[in-house]
């Protein structure tokens, strides 16, 4: 049995320990974890510096996601406190009813068991995942990217030390420190120990996990996110929404990557949005129609339309009408978040009913696809599949159903 299998075995052994903890204890531990992160912020920053010094090939936005300082650590700690304040996802009241023979059936909410997370260079995910799985009564196995290994080690050690202080087995939270592909391949196939696997990262990485895992997977989305500006759009509002969705945090999955513009307003609107986005440092690529309107737009390749840039790059297409926009989006979407900027109720209704995505917006930045913004608290990821969970996954997505039956000797005739 190799090291990853041992981690899986140990996680399975402690599932009942965390599942049976009273919610008051779970909440106090989360608060203590929050305090421990704040108290050890200098050690965390020092470890993070080692990661940053080694991460010479990362793009600017990806490097920003990796960086930890006192302020970001304070924000991560605050998210732990926020999770502690959320309602217990395991609490009742539970639905119950009686069978015709008289026995009682209770439909109970229970933890999934062992949750494995594979993610890239985002050390905040280490803490978010640990907090949400712990609050929902699960054990967690974390496997972060090599770019954040030093940060992940110290963060998990701090959280595990808090568990020890509460006389709990630290294996409730475990980190795989082997950053080779071998550890990923092993984790993908730990069906005996892992109940569900949640990958977060690029579309290519998530596709690899989905195609190669024998463990059940909740597919979280790459975000090839579109904004369609309809002919009825308020143009100043559209510019504000597009600017925010593209430039605020370009490396995240809910950032906008593609812009579709109705041809009736393209001549007027395109130069305005080009002015705005170029001033923000965005590289603009587009189809022939877009380039004929504004020569500052460079040519887009066929690959551009299916690429999640995670950077200050955006591709622009001019469309004939609402129907073409919807068809184009459904052909190229990653089923994450899609937006229409429009005042035409019929067009909005068609867009909402027909676009196949977890979240569909009217006149709102896609940057709001987020557990906190949706009122769920921190999120474990954004699911782009339709089974078990879809969209921002909060605490309830980390639970399942168990039926408890109480009777008095009934037998089936």
UniProtKB/Swiss-Prot annotation:
Major subcellular site: cytoplasm
Gene3D superfamilies recorded: Aldehyde Dehydrogenase, Chain A, domain 1 (3.40.605.10), Aldehyde Dehydrogenase, Chain A, domain 2 (3.40.309.10)
GO molecular function, one term: NADP binding
GO cellular component, one term: cytoplasm
Record EC number: 1.2.1.41
Pathways involved: Amino-acid biosynthesis; L-proline biosynthesis; L-glutamate 5-semialdehyde from L-glutamate: step 2/2
Xref: InterPro entries: Ald_DH/histidinol_DH, Ald_DH_C, Ald_DH_N, Aldehyde_DH_dom, G-glutamylP_reductase_CS, Glu-5-SA_DH, GPR_dom
Subcellular location field: Cytoplasm
Domain of life: Bacteria
Annotated catalysed reactions: L-glutamate 5-semialdehyde + phosphate + NADP(+) = L-glutamyl 5-phosphate + NADPH + H(+)
Main EC class the enzyme belongs to: oxidoreductase
Keywords for the protein's UniProt record, in alphabetical order: Amino-acid biosynthesis, Cytoplasm, NADP, Oxidoreductase, Proline biosynthesis
GO terms classed as biological process: L-proline biosynthetic process
Secretion signal, residue range per the UniProt entry: none
The family this protein is said to belong to: Belongs to the gamma-glutamyl phosphate reductase family.
NCBIfam families noted in UniProt: PRK00197.1, proA
Function, in words: Catalyzes the NADPH-dependent reduction of L-glutamate 5-phosphate into L-glutamate 5-semialdehyde and phosphate. The product spontaneously undergoes cyclization to form 1-pyrroline-5-carboxylate.
Entry protein name: Gamma-glutamyl phosphate reductase
Protein's organism: Leuconostoc mesenteroides subsp. mesenteroides (strain ATCC 8293 / DSM 20343 / BCRC 11652 / CCM 1803 / JCM 6124 / NCDO 523 / NBRC 100496 / NCIMB 8023 / NCTC 12954 / NRRL B-1118 / 37Y)
């Amino acid at each position: 049995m190799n090291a990853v299998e041992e981690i899986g075995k140990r996680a399975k052994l402690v599932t009942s320990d965390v599942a049976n903890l009273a919610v008051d204890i779970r909440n106090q531990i989360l608060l203590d974890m929050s305090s421990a992160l704040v108290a050890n912020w200098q050690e965390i920053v020092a470890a993070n510096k080692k990661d940053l010094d080694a991460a010479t090939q990362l793009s600017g936005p990806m490097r920003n996601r990796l960086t930890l300082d006192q302020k970001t650590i304070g924000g991560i700690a605050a998210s732990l406190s926020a999770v502690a304040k959320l309602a217990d996802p395991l609490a009742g009241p539970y639905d119950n009813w009686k069978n015709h023979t008289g026995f009682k059936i209770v439909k109970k909410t229970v933890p999934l068991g062992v949750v494995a997370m594979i993610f890239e260079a985002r050390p905040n995910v280490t803490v978010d995942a640990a907090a949400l799985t712990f609050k929902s009564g699960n054990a967690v196995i974390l496997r972060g990217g090599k770019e954040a290994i030093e940060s992940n080690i110290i963060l998990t050690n701090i959280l595990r030390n808090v568990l020890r202080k509460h006389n709990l087995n630290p294996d409730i939270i475990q980190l795989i420190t082997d950053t080779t592909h071998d550890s990923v391949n092993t984790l993908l196939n730990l069906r005996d120990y892992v109940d569900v696997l949640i990958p977060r990262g690029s579309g290519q990485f998530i596709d690899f996990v989905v195609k190669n895992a024998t463990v059940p997977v909740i597919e979280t989305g790459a975000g090839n996110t579109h904004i369609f500006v309809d002919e009825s759009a308020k143009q100043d509002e559209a510019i504000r929404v597009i600017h925010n969705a593209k430039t605020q945090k370009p490396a995240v999955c809910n950032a906008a990557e593609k812009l579709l513009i109705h041809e009736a307003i393209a001549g007027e609107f395109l130069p305005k949005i080009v002015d705005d986005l170029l001033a923000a440092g965005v590289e603009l690529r587009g189809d022939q129609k877009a380039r004929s309107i504004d020569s500052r737009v460079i040519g887009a390749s066929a690959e551009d339309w299916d690429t999640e840039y995670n950077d200050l790059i955006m591709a622009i297409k001019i469309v004939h009408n609402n129907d073409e926009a919807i068809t184009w989006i459904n052909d190229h979407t990653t089923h994450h978040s899609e937006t229409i900027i429009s005042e035409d109720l019929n067009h909005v209704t068609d867009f909402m009913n027909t676009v196949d995505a977890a979240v569909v917006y009217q006149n709102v930045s896609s940057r709001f696809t987020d557990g906190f913004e949706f009122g769920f608290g921190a999120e474990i990821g954004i699911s782009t599949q339709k089974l078990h969970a879809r969209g921002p996954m909060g605490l309830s997505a980390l639970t399942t159903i168990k039926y408890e039956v109480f009777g008095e000797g009934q037998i089936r005739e």
